Amino acid sequence: MGVALGYGIAAAVETGKPVIAIEGDSGFGFDGMEVETICRYKLPITIVVINNGGIYNGDKNPVKDQLGPTVLSHSAHYGEIATAFGGNSYRVNNYTEMKKALDEAYASGKPTVIDAQIPISMGKESGHIGNLNPQLNLDPAKNK
């Protein structure tokens, strides 16, 4: 998690061709500042951030105003980091908007971040870190 942009930079530098890097919002949290490098060197990389508001999915069962440790802000505008460094930014909510953003990003040849909003219910909780989410009960006997 969080290696897509490093691989994207390597692919763009090695081939000189446009690259599409796809990662989730949590992964982007690890390597998002690589957008500065991508913009500084004007690499033709389009980053698609799948934004569902969490490591696996957003907070479906909040307790009062406290979010679980695997929850991120679904309202974050991840594309704005590209704008800050001179790249392009799109926020999309459906297939038509995604296709348009990808077409425009490819045609521009500029570094681009596409913030792809998906429902917070999409994704799957991992049994390996599920115990970090206090709202999740991983006891199979209790989930029947």
Locations of the language-model features?
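Thiamine diphosphate
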Residues: 1-144
